[in-house]
Amino acid sequence: MAPKQDPKPKFQEGERVLCFHGPLLYEAKCVKVAIKDKQVKYFIHYSGWNKKSAVRPRRSEKSLKTHEDIVALFPVPEGAPSVHHPLLTSSWDEWVPESRVLKYVDTNLQKQRELQKANQEQYAEGKMRGAAPGKKTSGLQQKNVEVKTKKNKQKTPGNGDGGSTSETPQPPRKKRARVDPTVENEETFMNRVEVKVKIPEELKPWLVDDWDLITRQKQLFYLPAKKNVDSILEDYANYKKSRGNTDNKEYAVNEVVAGIKEYFNVMLGTQLLYKFERPQYAEILADHPDAPMSQVYGAPHLLRLFVRIGAMLAYTPLDEKSLALLLNYLHDFLKYLAKNSATLFSASDYEVAPPEYHRKAV
């Protein structure tokens, strides 16, 4: 019997593609193609991503047990000393399976736009629902750390978190003659582990006030912030060091703080801004093209990150124990924000946008 032939790659080296990274699609380039164990993989470079502007969740089949394992999920900040650990790399490029790669065609570009829009709407709706008393919400009223598999949920399709459960098995799907690779990617996405971080009760009102000040009252957070993200993170790191942590834990805190900063700088422009803020963001980019946004923005935008960061961590295929351990670090930082909320959050940090700005924001 003749040996089974290797599968034929759908994409070629140098080809422009779209690649799933987290819940979104990004423009990318196929740098290399490899076939191993009858599976096609591609070495992907994300267009426009570099050490200053990009971060990706680390992928490993290992279970994280030590502090060094945990911080390996975050990228090494530029200029930091090299850490010899198998989960850390210096490149933002990565090997991905064929199921995450799509052709760069109009239909998939439309899907990219739809996913981006849905992601932004889900973010806004999650913040709005957080203000409603007596109702379950998708993100703000979960347990401290919640890690669960979406495919194991028994909720009726289409229901939100407040929906009823159903014990009735779903009828089997009709078999398709051909499998759409786009649909395959979406199903894979829906089956991934869902990671949610609880926002402390003391901080929830600030999420709502922040939304109200910007979207309803048409005010803008004053930039540059009186106390920027870099300064907040530095204060937190110093606070943890002052409590007599061991060298290993101190190292972990430093790396987690650096990771939060990198995630913030990457996600701000695409996932952490309201529509009304975009002209302001464009002006900041024009005036300070080389400045990291963590040196410009402050506590309210940093808090928004923790509503969204779970979606990125969900694409790190680690077991529940490892994810919970990582999230403990993030939640500890949130407790620090809550403890210092009186000095970090204030409505006086916002200002009414001038008439000419309103014309830009239309």
Curated annotation (Swiss-Prot):
Location of the protein in the cell: Nucleus
Primary localization class, coarse: nucleus
MRG domain segment(s): 191-362
Chain intervals for the UniProt region annotation (Interaction with RB1-2): 323-344
Motif Nuclear localization signal per UniProt: ranges: 135-146
Domain Tudor-knot: 12-51
Modified residues (N6-acetyllysine): 143
Cellular component GO terms held in the UniProt record: NuA4 histone acetyltransferase complex; nuclear speck; nucleoplasm; nucleosome; Sin3-type complex
Chain segments carrying region Interaction with KAT8: 26-62
SUPFAM superfamilies, per database record: Chromo domain-like
Region named Interaction with RB1-1: 164-230
Region (Sufficient for interaction with SIN3A): 133-266
Function: Component of the NuA4 histone acetyltransferase (HAT) complex which is involved in transcriptional activation of select genes principally by acetylation of nucleosomal histones H4 and H2A. This modification may both alter nucleosome - DNA interactions and promote interaction of the modified histones with other proteins which positively regulate transcription.
Protein name (Swiss-Prot/TrEMBL): Mortality factor 4-like protein 1
Lineage, top ranks: Eukaryota, Metazoa, Chordata, Craniata, Vertebrata
Gene: MORF4L1
